């Protein structure tokens, strides 16, 4: 059977973390137009932490979600306008307003063990006639069987697709393979499976390829890998591999390369790449969007970013606990002072 992929671009949602949620609607429009012309199937637009994510805790955006989404809608001809919502941050009212602005696909995201909080939002999105995916973040923190049980819950609420979401870039190929197989064992045949990979261990393309080999049909990727931490699966090399594998998709490789180099890389105030800090995210299994918060704490308190991230991983922090990074830095500073004093 021929493998056909749905390529979901996340440059303008996960990629918001890479620019601290600061991008003009004009730039959003240019990137969306380029992605649409390049043939991607879906384009996700929102604050990095989803609808209503702009806050002191997560980081304020330069513009509202609505300004970004309107700019995107004005530049679409065929791609599915998508957004992301975390219950407890985004509300039903915001979901409904996104629909009014033209969003027709939504990913409802929860921590990997908290699928039950997604029921209302998935139900409302289905009621509106939207395409709905469940997004189980930090998927490495649950065993394959536990994660699959959570995926089954999202399916029961009405999700058309459920993702293995490697928010920390911690999964290896075997970890992805085991989780996709566990999903397939419990989900209905009609329910799609998606993969959302991060590059922190330099495995995002490999993990996405393994996922497709195991039956995944929806693949998240971004221009130049633009995303939290070391970035997401870079769309250009993934599409190149998909071509070599003979997988069917609608994307134009050269057009994606041009958009990545001409439009996205110039926006990055910090290179999106594997380096000592971003590698530590994957090594410690830390939520990728914690990078900029940890770097700010490091600069303020003089603690190595890697030391902070290792402690974040040891304590098992999850999305929404960004404020505890400062507490961790202060604890480490106090421990260093005690060590020097003794």
UniProtKB/Swiss-Prot annotation:
<dbReference type="Pfam" id="PF00682">
    <property type="entry name" value="HMGL-like"/>
</dbReference>
<feature type="binding site">
    <location>
        <position position="196"/>
    </location>
    <ligand>
        <name>substrate</name>
    </ligand>
</feature>
<feature type="binding site">
    <location>
        <position position="196"/>
    </location>
    <ligand>
        <name>Mn(2+)</name>
    </ligand>
</feature>
<keyword id="KW-0479">Metal-binding</keyword>
<feature type="site" description="Transition state stabilizer">
    <location>
        <position position="13"/>
    </location>
</feature>
<dbReference type="GO" id="GO:0003852">
    <property type="term" value="F:2-isopropylmalate synthase activity"/>
</dbReference>
<keyword id="KW-0456">Lyase</keyword>
<feature type="binding site">
    <location>
        <begin position="13"/>
        <end position="14"/>
    </location>
    <ligand>
        <name>substrate</name>
    </ligand>
</feature>
<feature type="binding site">
    <location>
        <position position="14"/>
    </location>
    <ligand>
        <name>Mn(2+)</name>
    </ligand>
</feature>
<dbReference type="InterPro" id="IPR012425">
    <property type="entry name" value="DmpG_comm"/>
</dbReference>
<dbReference type="Pfam" id="PF07836">
    <property type="entry name" value="DmpG_comm"/>
</dbReference>
<keyword id="KW-0614">Plasmid</keyword>
<feature type="binding site">
    <location>
        <position position="287"/>
    </location>
    <ligand>
        <name>substrate</name>
    </ligand>
</feature>
<feature type="active site" description="Proton acceptor">
    <location>
        <position position="17"/>
    </location>
</feature>
<feature type="domain" description="Pyruvate carboxyltransferase">
    <location>
        <begin position="5"/>
        <end position="257"/>
    </location>
</feature>
<keyword id="KW-0464">Manganese</keyword>
<keyword id="KW-0058">Aromatic hydrocarbons catabolism</keyword>
<dbReference type="InterPro" id="IPR050073">
    <property type="entry name" value="2-IPM_HCS-like"/>
</dbReference>
<dbReference type="GO" id="GO:0009056">
    <property type="term" value="P:catabolic process"/>
</dbReference>
<dbReference type="InterPro" id="IPR000891">
    <property type="entry name" value="PYR_CT"/>
</dbReference>
<dbReference type="InterPro" id="IPR013785">
    <property type="entry name" value="Aldolase_TIM"/>
</dbReference>
<dbReference type="GO" id="GO:0030145">
    <property type="term" value="F:manganese ion binding"/>
</dbReference>
<protein>
    <recommendedName>
        <fullName>4-hydroxy-2-oxovalerate aldolase 5</fullName>
        <ecNumber>4.1.3.39</ecNumber>
    </recommendedName>
</protein>
<dbReference type="InterPro" id="IPR017629">
    <property type="entry name" value="4OH_2_O-val_aldolase"/>
</dbReference>
<feature type="binding site">
    <location>
        <position position="167"/>
    </location>
    <ligand>
        <name>substrate</name>
    </ligand>
</feature>
<dbReference type="GO" id="GO:0008701">
    <property type="term" value="F:4-hydroxy-2-oxovalerate aldolase activity"/>
</dbReference>
<feature type="binding site">
    <location>
        <position position="198"/>
    </location>
    <ligand>
        <name>Mn(2+)</name>
    </ligand>
</feature>
<comment type="similarity">
    <text>Belongs to the 4-hydroxy-2-oxovalerate aldolase family.</text>
</comment>
<dbReference type="InterPro" id="IPR035685">
    <property type="entry name" value="DRE_TIM_HOA"/>
</dbReference>
<dbReference type="GO" id="GO:0009098">
    <property type="term" value="P:L-leucine biosynthetic process"/>
</dbReference>
């Amino acid at each position: 059977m021929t493998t056909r992929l749905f390529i979901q671009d996340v440059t303008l949602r996960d990629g918001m973390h890479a620019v601290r949620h600061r991008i003009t609607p004009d730039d959003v429009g240019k990137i969306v137009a380029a992605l649409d012309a390049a043939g991607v199937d879906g384009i996700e637009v929102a604050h990095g932490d989803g609808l209503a994510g702009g806050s002191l805790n997560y980081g304020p955006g330069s513009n509202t979600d609505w300004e970004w989404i309107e700019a995107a809608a004005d530049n679409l001809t065929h791609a599915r306008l998508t957004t992301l919502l975390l219950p407890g941050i985004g509300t039903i009212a915001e979901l409904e307003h996104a629909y009014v602005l033209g969003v027709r696909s939504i990913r409802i995201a929860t921590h990997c063990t908290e699928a039950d909080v997604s029921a209302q939002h998935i139900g409302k999105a289905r009621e509106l006639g939207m395409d709905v995916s469940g997004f189980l973040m930090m998927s490495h923190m649950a065993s394959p069987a536990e994660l699959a049980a959570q995926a089954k819950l999202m399916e029961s609420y009405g999700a058309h697709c459920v993702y293995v979401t490697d928010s920390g870039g911690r999964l290896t190929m075997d970890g992805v393979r085991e989780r996709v197989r566990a999903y397939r064992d419990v989900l209905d045949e009609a329910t799609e499976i998606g993969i959302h990979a991060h590059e922190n261990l330099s495995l995002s393309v490999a993990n996405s390829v393994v996922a497709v080999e195991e039956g995944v049909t929806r693949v998240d990727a971004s221009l130049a890998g633009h995303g939290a931490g070391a970035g997401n699966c870079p769309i250009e090399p993934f599409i190149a591999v998909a071509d070599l594998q003979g997988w069917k998709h609608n994307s134009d490789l050269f057009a994606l390369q041009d958009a990545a180099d001409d439009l996205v890389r110039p926006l990055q105030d910090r290179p999106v790449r594997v380096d000592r800090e971003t590698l530590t995210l994957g090594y410690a299994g830390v939520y990728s969007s914690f990078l900029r918060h940890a770097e700010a704490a490091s600069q303020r308190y003089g603690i190595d970013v890697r030391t902070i991230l290792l402690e974040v991983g040891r304590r098992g922090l999850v999305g929404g606990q960004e404020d505890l990074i400062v507490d961790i830095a202060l604890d480490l500073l106090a421990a260093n002072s005690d060590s020097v004093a003794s």
